[in-house]
Amino acid sequence: MFKRQTTGSVVCASCGYLVGVNDATCYNCGRRNPGLWGFAPALRSLGKDLGFVPFVTGTCIALYALGLLASGGQVMRGGLFSFLSPSALALFLFGASGQTPVFDYGRWWTVLSASWLHAGLLHILFNVLWIRNLGPVVGELYGAGRMVIIYTVAGVTGFAMSSLAGETMGWLPIRALQGAQITVGASAPIFGLLGALVYYGRSTG
């Protein structure tokens, strides 16, 4: 039950120390409003990620299924890595990013939406597994709020750079450096989570 606690002690949302539910700051880590207006216990019941990881994976799966439905009979085409793949048109309409959507059609918002879309069964399977493994760990180490910021900023940055490379670096002889005409997937946010873990490990020894 999502219930507000008005008296007693709660666990600080940042450091895990016991604090008064109405304390202005945590005596251990200095966080302001450590009791989160009395909702800290209810929020902690959602997990270290405050339910963000299940939300991301569930939304990705739902959008993938909708993409398949919108693609009609085109989903069975191609080999193993394109098996059950939504059509390029469906991905474009749902918010795929890349040089074509961003620069040719002015769909700048796709740098935010593309990380929620996937281009095939194996694509979404591997990404969902990575998110489910990395997300809770990053949430525990950094806090749910910072984890959401890391995930979102990494996704936006990755797709923005890929789209920009597709617009300006097509002349390069190495295909991997030429960016993408159209692209989807949670790889950029996943690398953001992984980078956060690497940074935490290096900074704490």
Regions of interest found by a model, annotated:
Residues 1-5:
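A broadly conserved sequence feature marking short terminus-proximal activation segments
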Residues 7-23, 27-205:
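A detector for small-residue-rich transmembrane helices and their helix-helix packing motifs
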